[in-house]
Amino acid sequence: MAMASFGQLNLEEPPPIWGSRSVDCFEKLEQIGEGTYGQVYMAKEIKTGEIVALKKIRMDNEREGFPITAIREIKILKKLHHENVIQLKEIVTSPGRDRDDQGKPDNNKYKGGIYMVFEYMDHDLTGLADRPGLRFTVPQIKCYMKQLLTGLHYCHVNQVLHRDIKGSNLLIDNEGNLKLADFGLARSYSHDHTGNLTNRVITLWYRPPELLLGATKYGPAIDMWSVGCIFAELLHAKPILPGKNEQEQLNKIFELCGSPDEKLWPGVSKMPWFNNFKPARPLKRRVREFFRHFDRHALELLEKMLVLDPAQRISAKDALDAEYFWTDPLPCDPKSLPTYESSHEFQTKKKRQQQRQNEEAAKRQKLQHPPLQHSRLPPLQHGGQSHAAPHWPAGPNHPTNNAPPQVPAGPSHNFYGKPRGPPGPNRYPPSGNQSGGYNQSRGGYSSGSYPPQGRGAPYVAGPRGPSGGPYGVGPPNYTQGGQYGGSGSSGRGQNQRNQQYGWQQ
């Protein structure tokens, strides 16, 4: 099937695949996502029993009717048909005031609601990676990365920028298939486009330096920076650039990738916010140093993705042809991957939040009801040379601070029935804070040793930007071509090692 070709979307047209069916045809089972757009629910079609995802379009802040971002998303997904892009099935409406999965009325001041119906996917990459004890294998990482790049290459060939690549927007089913989702920030583009685009896109940790420096003219390279961050995150077992704000994000980028200058990045000094955010001192590129535990071919590919100058950043098509995907161990067949219990970022965050609340409640309970102190203590035994009193934590099992240790009287506390002798200087630990456990910094890029490649410990949980249900679309099948040239599938094809897509048989 030939790929669709399209340019700017006509936002005056009514959204496509607008059905006449009501949301009452579905039974909401569980909320699996939430964001600025609304909520995402796992639901079951009552008539067929098919499990789907319902993405509710938030209308309460829209004074002018249907949100333009939703129109863009629907139109783009209607045009995209690929096995690595989420499929939008239909649009349904609710005739009256809508209710959530618990039967409570929502806050929509308008009557009715609008839902996008998507194929259901069991996981998103963030939720899956956050599962305790889960370790991705190297063939598994290669499999996911190959599918991500294939889907993104298809989008770029069809002149669509995703503009929000992150783990929670990469959906995975229990057959190992990965699909790009949440096209709420996506838009079409053309190489001869002269207008300005917003730079307030892409979640901060995955945002490229050109957007952070104020660029308003950009192309597919912005998505490839995000892919590089995802790639390193899979291998490093945690996010690599977790900035708290734009300034800190740029600092982390420059500390890793070096200072930008006119030699390495022509035109950078003319970018709108360069003078505000340029490093105070020259910084050298340290990607190879920070990620020296990576496989050689993985590091070579990552170096080409995390390039400051977008004009020199590798494309999705060229990345698919990298040696990384054509050397052992090869990407595995998606169907060979293990199945897991449903894991979405929204659910894992909710579980962590509940766990924190339980821990805080336990602490409050302990403060309100402290352990009872001993009301009767045996008399102190003194004798021999006196020593400085050690520092003991207060509590029922230790003497009070700044006083000699209290020893109960009685034969059971005598050594072989003889009176206890004078306390020696080494009987108790010295006063002061005792060292124990680890006091390691978890920041930066050198927080410990890592396995040679693949996942070590599970992701370190942390804020990942807005948590959003990532559903976004199109049926599989396409032939690549277009601006990159060629009519076959991307990459080296199936003539190498007689393996289609480079998968092990």
UniProtKB/Swiss-Prot annotation:
Binding annotation for ATP: I32, G33, E34, G35, T36, Y37, G38, Q39, V40, K55
Region named Disordered: 336-505
Location of the Protein kinase domain: 26-325
Biased composition (Low complexity): 429-456, 492-505
Reaction catalysed by this enzyme: L-seryl-[protein] + ATP = O-phospho-L-seryl-[protein] + ADP + H(+); L-threonyl-[protein] + ATP = O-phospho-L-threonyl-[protein] + ADP + H(+); [DNA-directed RNA polymerase] + ATP = phospho-[DNA-directed RNA polymerase] + ADP + H(+)
CDD domains named among the record's database cross-references: STKc_CDK9_like
UniProt-listed SMART domains: S_TKc (SM00220)
Active site: D164 (proton acceptor)
EC number annotated for this UniProt entry: 2.7.11.22, 2.7.11.23
Residue spans of biased composition, Gly residues class: 482-491
Signal peptide: none
Gene Ontology MF term list: ATP binding; cyclin-dependent protein serine/threonine kinase activity; kinase activity; protein serine kinase activity; RNA polymerase II CTD heptapeptide repeat kinase activity
Tissue expression per record: Highly expressed in flowers. Expressed in seedlings, roots, rosettes and stems.
Key words of the record: ATP-binding, Kinase, Nucleotide-binding, Phosphoprotein, Serine/threonine-protein kinase, Transferase
List of residues that carry Phosphothreonine: T198
InterPro entries, sorted: CDK, Kinase-like_dom_sf, Prot_kinase_dom, Protein_kinase_ATP_BS, Ser/Thr_kinase_AS
UniProt GO BP: response to virus
Gene3D superfamilies: Phosphorylase Kinase, domain 1 (3.30.200.20), Transferase(Phosphotransferase) domain 1 (1.10.510.10)
Location of Phosphotyrosine modifications: Y37
Family membership noted in the UniProt record: Belongs to the protein kinase superfamily. CMGC Ser/Thr protein kinase family. CDC2/CDKX subfamily.
PANTHER family linked to this entry: CELL DIVISION PROTEIN KINASE, CYCLIN-DEPENDENT KINASE 12
SUBUNIT field: Interacts with CYCT1-3.
Protein's name in the database: Cyclin-dependent kinase C-1
Organism of this sequence: Arabidopsis thaliana (Mouse-ear cress)
Gene (UniProt): CDKC-1
